[in-house]
Amino acid sequence: NDDVYASLDFDGYHIDQVGDRGNVYDYYGSKLNLVDGFASFIKKMKMRQLNKSLVMNAVANFGSQQIAGTRDVDFLYSELWSGESAFSDLLSIMKTNQSYNDSLAQVYAAYMDYNSSKSEFNTPGVLLTDAVMFAIGADHLELGDHMLCNEYFPNSNLKMSDALKTAIVHYYDFFTAYENILRDKGTQNYDAIYSGNSSVIINNWPPKLNTVTAYTKEVNGKEIIHLLNFVKANSLSWRDLDGSMPEPETINSLSLGVRASSVKKIWVASPDCYGGAPQELHFRQQGDYVAFTVPSLKYWTMIVIEK
């Protein structure tokens, strides 16, 4: 560790592991507690180089509590596999990990189209997964020299289409522009959201097929509603293993009713249109409820209600 930093000006160290291997033993036949070993290893590395950053991969969340509990890593980092393949897992894992250390953000290593034999990533699958991750406040480790499709990072069998290259920039611009709204701590809200369109069902988190799923959070006095389009989705797995997630149809002029009083302003923004720029909406206050119309929803539209 010291020799590496003496020769190379790295910012820090990425510590990896291979996940839960059941009972393991040392050379002398004594049983090992790997997760406790992770924590002591991190702490000793930090003590030797206090100014260097550390992160450790919790493969399938193995050891995540011990890793986070050291408070010596820069963020919560989980590599997800088949046991954590549901969209709903993305929020539950993040909440669990942040219960161990609520000062750190969650980053997922999550490989898209893992079993696909195609030559390109499936754009709808990638964008829907990123939409969900970003909406809940997590990040996706997916870009380097190329987009990752495999735990072996040099694997570049799948390429990004021109459409995906363009869209992914909009998504990361959006995530950066609105990071305080997306990442600041808040309280999840489960109040019903009423649709004025009989053909569109609004479903509160967790995601459900054939619906628009809403993830709602109170952040710094604002009510933030993320609309996620699962109307045409063919699976509730973020992995899109064979690259078959269909492109959603854009829903235009979606009338909604939300429980919210003393509303001062409502605006929407989406990485799918207008470069993520905010659009202020007209609204109608009716007692404890407010009615308004969302201009469009493709993958993800964020609604901000200011009170």
Q: Where does each model-flagged region fall?
A:
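Acidic-and-aromatic substrate-binding clefts and catalytic sites of carbohydrate-active enzymes
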Residues: 60-66, 80-90, 114-123, 149-151, ...
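Carbohydrate-binding surface patches
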Residues: 200-260, 301
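Conserved, mostly hydrophobic/aromatic
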Residues: 16, 74, 133, 225, ...
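Active-site neighborhood of glycoside hydrolase catalytic domains
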Residues: 1-75, 81-92
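Aromatic/acidic polysaccharide-binding cleft in carbohydrate-active enzymes
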Residues: 17, 98-189, 219, 231
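C-terminal beta-strand-rich structural cap/linker in extracellular carbohydrate-active enzymes
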Residues: 285-307
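A cross-family glycoside hydrolase active-site/sugar-binding cleft signature
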Residues: 14-16, 55-59, 79, 107-111, ...
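Solvent-exposed beta-hairpin/edge-strand motifs
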Residues: 251-276
